[in-house]
């Protein structure tokens, strides 16, 4: 029997995912008390409303996030987002992930998930410090070897303390979606699972939260 492993953070009112971006505002558009007058059988309903930037919680970047002519969320191929064979690369000392840390792994046609353990700092100031990230050479290595989606449990797959974004540029330029702010990767085996991170089909947007998860058969 298959087992599901949740790899996503909970989205809560006011939480900060990325410094400088506003947290989400979650409220009732239609509350239960107000809805009661519309039904004769005692039924009540809540219709929620959320105001947020796309880069909230655990989210997926499509090529449109980086490139004006890249595929947006509505144009992504589901085959690259759901049921993808997965592999986990573990680098837990906080240092950058280089090609040598992935040598010997077959990543072609796979979801490559980078386990750094940085999610332990989620919703603390430390989360935005000197975080683990991929180098440009690691991005080249993954793109050249046919990875089809890449995820990380850190606050950015690039080094956000410099002004360049070579990893986003290389991976999204190769049509490889990126899933950031993941959690729970320590619960996965190195191999032998399938991965899913499917955003809603929104035209004209490059990023949106996902319920990232793994399926263990």
PLM region descriptions:
Residues 1-217:
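Active-/binding-site microenvironments in catalytic and ligand-binding cores
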């Amino acid at each position: 029997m298959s087992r599901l492993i949740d790899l996503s953070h909970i989205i809560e009112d006011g939480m900060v995912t990325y410094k400088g971006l506003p947290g989400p505002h979650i409220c009732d558009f239609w509350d239960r008390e107000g809805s009661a007058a519309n039904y004769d059988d005692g039924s009540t309903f809540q219709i929620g409303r959320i105001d947020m930037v796309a880069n909230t919680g655990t989210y997926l970047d499509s090529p449109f996030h980086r490139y004006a002519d890249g595929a947006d969320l509505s144009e992504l191929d589901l085959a690259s987002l759901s049921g993808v064979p997965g592999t986990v690369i573990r680098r837990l000392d906080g240092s950058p992930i280089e090609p040598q840390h992935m040598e010997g792994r077959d990543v072609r046609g796979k979801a490559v998930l980078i386990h750094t353990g940085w999610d332990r700092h989620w919703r603390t100031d430390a989360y935005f410090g000197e975080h683990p990230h991929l180098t440009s050479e690691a991005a080249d290595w993954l793109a050249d070897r046919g990875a089809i989606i890449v995820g990380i449990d850190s606050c950015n797959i690039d080094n956000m303390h410099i002004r360049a974004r070579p990893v986003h540029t290389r991976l999204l330029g190769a049509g490889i979606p990126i899933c950031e702010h993941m959690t729970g990767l320590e619960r996965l085996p190195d191999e032998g699972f399938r991965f899913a991170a499917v955003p809603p089909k929104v035209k004209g947007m490059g990023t949106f939260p996902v319920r990232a998860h793994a399926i263990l058969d």
